[in-house]
Amino acid sequence: KPMVVFGMGGHASFPVCIAAKTLGIPFIIYENNIQIGKSNKYLLPFACKIFTSYEELVGIKNKYDHKVVVTGNIIREEILNFKKKNQFTEDVLNILVLGGSQAAKSFGEILPGVFQECKKENVNIKIFQQCTESQNTKLNEAYKNLNFDFELFNFTNNISEYFSKAQLVITRSGSSVTAELINCKIPFISIPYPHATDSHQDKNATYFEKKGYSISVKETEVNKKLFSLIKSFYKDRKLLDRMIEQQKKHSDKEVFVRINKTIKKLLNE
């Protein structure tokens, strides 16, 4: 019989935590979005603690504030220990485009037009873009016609290799990838998925922008705003440096120390 159960949020951990409650086993839940998820919201009244990635947590009642422990993001050791190796030049801006299958498809459709504007305005960029296999040929032809350096990839087990190459990232505002970017001190433009449950990606993006970690652009405004942002970053790298300085104020290095300390204290009560 376990002494404590740790639920990482989402549908998978929900029945396990309910079983723990039924058996009288204390459990802890973890929320890595700014907006508490539905499963965690239901479980919170019965949980001993809720670990959070950031200081802000939307969607909980004040009476549960005492259960909140800000631990930071639970992320891979490879990312926790990430150190950027590449040296960058002022005459080119390296942009990494990240997204899962849905995001990759959307970005593959809307970004070529933005990058075409960069070419017209002599904004010298190099693109590393995650795309779906079905987009390989079309994007390859489009970017070759624009005559700038680019690399397309579908999936990688070594994302840190691409992080090392990036000065700016264009991504959705899901909790996992943004946590890794903040830890690696890489400025990013987040384009929230407009149909995310409880608009949690919008809330993540708003929080990150408020903190100065990133810039948020709604998908409906990409064609209007994204080129201007890229041009600004290309012309003035200090804008990127400011975001990096803000990201340095957030640290996940002690996340496992904080978690272990809280669990040990709980078990000794």
Where are these regions (language model features)?
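Short hydrophobic beta-strand element within catalytic cores of glycosyltransferases
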Residues: 171, 187-198
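An aromatic- and histidine-rich active-site surface loop
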Residues: 4-23
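C-terminal "capping" alpha-helix adjacent to the active site of nucleotide-linked donor transferases
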Residues: 211-212, 216-238
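Donor-nucleotide binding loops and adjacent catalytic segments primarily
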Residues: 83-169, 202-205, 217-226
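A short, well-ordered alpha-helix in the C-terminal region of glycosyltransferases
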Residues: 239-253
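Acidic donor-binding loop of glycosyltransferase active sites
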Residues: 2-4, 164-179, 186-187
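Active-site-proximal region of nucleotide-activated glycan assembly enzymes
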Residues: 21-82
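C-terminal alpha-helical cap of glycosyltransferases
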Residues: 252-269
